[in-house]
Amino acid sequence: SVPPRVCRCPPGRPTTRQASAAGHGPYVSTYEILSSNTWIAVTFFLLLQWRIRMFVHLGALVMPLAFVMMGFALMGSAELKALSPTLQSAWLLVHIVFAKLTVSGMLVAVALSIAQLLKDSRAPESGFLTKLPSVDVLDDYAYRLVAFSFITLTVMIITGSIWANNSWGHYWSWDPTETWSLVVWLVYGLYLHGRITFKWSKAISTWYIILSFLFSIVAFFIIPYFVKSQHSQYMVG
């Protein structure tokens, strides 16, 4: 069965109460988006850990990343917001589900990449590092998770375009958030291209994953604060 820890993760209950009280899912403010991202990412990792036992000790890296994300969530306003008519769409829900799966896959891929850097460092291995799989195995799973995230990101963009057409009458308007989503998609596509075509080394791949994740954070969660877009109504605040 799934480890019982999944029921004790702190972001879950406030996110659930928030969604219940507002009458909509947790996707209408920075607090709701990031706290639900944290909850889903931790659940995603626990499911991976359940299926792939060698991931048990990777939690020492995944959980700090999750707590940082939750910390940023708590910096946002927890004020309940009404759901605007443009957000009342089944396509939006699909769009959001795949967005959260993308974040989850990226987060665990980054944890695997950090684990690779620690195991590759000249310092002698100690503690949980000795219990992690080899660098080759970590690299392989990081690659798989980025491929998974690339697929979910693709679905996120496609369903977002369908939602935009239903709400505003166009599939693509080069809205800043749309544009930066495309840039992030190209960044992760370049990683897969580099791995498959140019046989990038593990060192290049590891750093690329980490830097790409940082770039995606800026694109999805920081730029909307400075550039007005159709997404700003629910991503900022």
Predicted regions: what they are:
Residues 83-91:
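Active-site-proximal inter-transmembrane loops
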Residues 88, 132, 168-171:
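Short helix/strand-bridging catalytic loops that position acidic/His residues to coordinate divalent metals
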Residues 1-82, 94-121, 137-167, 173-237:
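Hydrophobic cores of alpha-helical transmembrane segments in multi-pass integral membrane proteins
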Residues 122-138:
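Membrane-interface interhelical connector segments
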